[in-house]
Structure formats: structure tokens, C-alpha cells
């Protein structure tokens, strides 16, 4: 490596050739002295082949010099726009075939009075395990991969079992819902008409309460025991019933209580107004109610 520097005068581009297997490194550009106070900006150019590139802009007041990092390996030309002075380009040349140009640069800098940056003292350490340790580590890795694969298989199997369980539960729920629907449909069926009671049973309130007849459709009548005494209440004649309804509710009810059908053969109590259908019932009533009073 050798120092390199040129002066580029005004109005003329400077053509340069790095040479065979040589590189030119431009590191600094500075303006020359000026007799007149120049305030205009000065532009710097480098031309390589047919390409003209702007390096930078200098000014005597603000930027009289410029640091660059330009490396050229073939013919080039330097130029500027200053009409009253010269511009100086400096750097160094390097042999392109040199295997270690950095060492040459450091030596040149030290010779020029610059201290090169110290190289890092840290060395790369290659951590290499012994063969036995490497083999053991590979075995451990293989075992770990097998365990991971077995865990994955177990998780997949458990996932399949859970899916089957869920489908079974959904099927059972559907069966239960279908059974419930069948039960509801059976309950909604029209109930069978109950058998008509025997003629012997009394129906005194059939004309008074028509609503009771509707309820009788849903209730199975109980069979009457012929052995037990039965209280028979006479049903009034329709013509009499109509007269009672037109005459008033309270008068009709009083007349019903006072009427005793004699044609039915009822036995009446002499001490009170109660009637019975059999003599046995009358005797039981007399013993229970009136014998104690006598």
C-alpha cells in the first residue's frame, strides 16, 4: 500500500488509471486556497465510464473538506465546479493481489503517526464434546423423541375416546328425548269415555251443576256398595224446577229442603227433619242422636 494524492484544477477533469491489479482508495477531499472570498457551493464529481456521479458539495465557509470511502479499480476521472481554484483528492493505493491488505493499512497508519485499533484478543472456542458424551446425548434425544411421539399417540387416542363418549351421550339424549315425546303423545290422547253408572246411583245435582258432567268424563266413577245404606235424594220435576229458578235462588233452595218425596218410601225422623231410605238407617240415627237426649 502506498500514499496517493492528486490536484484537480478548475475547468479540466483529471483522468486517472489505478494500474494493473491496483485499487485507488479516496479517503479525503479538500479545497485549495482562495484569494477571493468565495461563498458559492462547489460540487465534486467522479466519472466511471459513461456514469458521472456526485461525490459531495464543499464550501469555504461551512465545509472546506470532506471524508469519503471511495474505492476504484479501473480508469476514472475527477472534476469539480470551482472556477477560481483547485481541489485536492488524497488517499492510498492498494495491491489487489495482496491477501491481507488490512495489515498493510495498519502498518501505514502507524508509520504516519496514527494508532491502529487493537484487534480483539478473544478467540473463538469450539465446544466439542467427547465421542461418548455425544453418543449419550444422541441416545437421550432419541428417547425424548420417542416419548414425545408416544405422548402424541396417547393424546390422539384419548381424543378419539372422548369423541366416542360424546357421540354416545348425544345418542342417549336423543333416545331419551324420543321416549319423552312418545310419553307426551300418549298423554295427549283422548281419554276413554267412562262407563255410565248404574241406574241405582242417584244424580240429584245433574240439573243444578252442568259443569260437573264435564268433569265426569275424566274421572272413573266408583262402584257403590249395595250393602251400605244409600241416601236417596229425590229429583224435582222439571216444571217445578223451572218455577223455582224463576222465583229466586233462596226460595227454591228452601223449598227443596222442605220437600220430602213420599213416593220413594223414605223413612223420616219424628224428632228432626232428616229422612232415610231404610228403617235400619233411621234406627241408627235415632239411637245416635235422640236416645241420648231422651
UniProtKB/Swiss-Prot annotation:
Family matches, as PROSITE patterns: ZINC_FINGER_C2H2_1, ZINC_FINGER_C2H2_2
Region (Disordered): 124-269
Record flagged with keyword DNA repair: no
Modified residues (N-acetylmethionine): 1
Bias (Acidic residues) ranges: 140-188
InterPro entries tied to this protein: NPL, Znf_C2H2_type
Entry annotated with the keyword Manganese: no
Annotated region (Required to repress transcription), positions in chain: 2-5
Biased composition (Low complexity): 203-213
GO molecular function, one term: transcription cis-regulatory region binding
Alphabetically ordered keywords of this record: Acetylation, Chromatin regulator, Developmental protein, Hydrolase, Metal-binding, Nucleus, Repressor, Transcription, Transcription regulation, Zinc, Zinc-finger
Record-level GO BP terms: chromatin organization; negative regulation of DNA-templated transcription; response to abscisic acid; response to cold; response to salt stress; response to water deprivation
Record's note on what induces expression: Repressed by abscisic acid.
One cellular component (GO) term of this entry: plasma membrane
Coiled coil: none
S-S bridge residues: none
Protein family: Belongs to the histone deacetylase HD2 family.
Quaternary structure annotation from Swiss-Prot or TrEMBL: Interacts with DNMT2.
UniProt name for this protein: Histone deacetylase HDT3
Organism annotation: Arabidopsis thaliana
Highest classification ranks of the organism: Eukaryota, Viridiplantae, Streptophyta, Embryophyta, Tracheophyta
Amino acid at each position: 500500500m502506498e500514499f496517493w494524492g492528486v490536484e484537480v484544477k478548475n475547468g479540466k477533469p483529471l483522468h486517472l488509471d489505478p494500474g494493473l491489479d491496483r485499487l485507488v482508495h479516496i479517503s479525503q477531499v479538500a479545497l485549495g486556497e482562495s484569494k477571493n472570498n468565495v461563498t458559492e457551493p462547489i460540487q465534486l464529481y467522479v466519472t466511471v465510464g459513461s456514469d458521472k456521479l456526485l461525490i459531495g458539495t464543499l464550501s469555504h465557509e461551512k465545509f472546506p473538506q470532506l471524508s469519503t470511502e471511495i474505492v476504484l479499480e479501473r480508469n476514472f476521472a475527477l472534476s469539480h465546479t470551482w472556477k477560481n481554484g483547485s481541489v485536492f483528492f488524497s488517499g492510498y493505493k492498494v495491491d489487489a493481489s495482496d491477501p491481507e491488505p488490512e495489515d498493510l493499512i495498519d502498518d501505514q497508519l502507524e508509520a504516519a503517526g496514527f494508532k491502529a485499533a487493537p484487534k480483539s484478543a478473544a478467540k473463538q472456542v469450539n465446544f466439542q464434546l467427547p465421542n461418548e458424551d455425544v453418543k449419550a446425548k444422541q441416545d437421550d434425544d432419541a428417547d425424548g423423541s420417542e416419548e414425545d411421539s408416544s405422548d402424541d399417540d396417547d393424546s390422539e387416542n384419548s381424543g378419539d375416546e372422548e369423541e366416542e363418549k360424546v357421540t354416545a351421550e348425544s345418542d342417549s339424549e336423543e333416545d331419551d328425548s324420543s321416549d319423552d315425546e312418545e310419553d307426551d303423545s300418549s298423554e295427549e290422547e283422548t281419554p276413554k269415555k267412562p262407563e255410565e253408572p248404574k241406574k241405582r246411583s242417584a244424580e240429584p245435582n245433574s240439573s243444578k251443576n252442568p259443569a260437573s258432567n264435564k268433569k265426569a268424563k275424566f274421572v272413573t266413577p266408583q262402584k257403590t256398595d249395595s250393602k251400605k245404606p244409600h241416601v236417596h235424594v229425590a229429583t224435582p220435576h222439571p216444571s217445578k224446577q223451572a218455577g223455582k229458578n224463576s222465583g229466586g235462588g233462596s226460595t227454591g233452595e228452601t223449598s227443596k229442603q222442605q220437600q220430602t218425596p213420599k213416593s220413594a218410601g223414605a223413612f223420616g225422623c219424628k224428632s228432626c227433619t232428616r229422612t232415610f231410605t231404610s228403617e235400619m238407617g233411621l234406627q241408627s240415627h235415632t239411637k245416635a242422636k235422640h236416645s241420648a237426649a231422651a
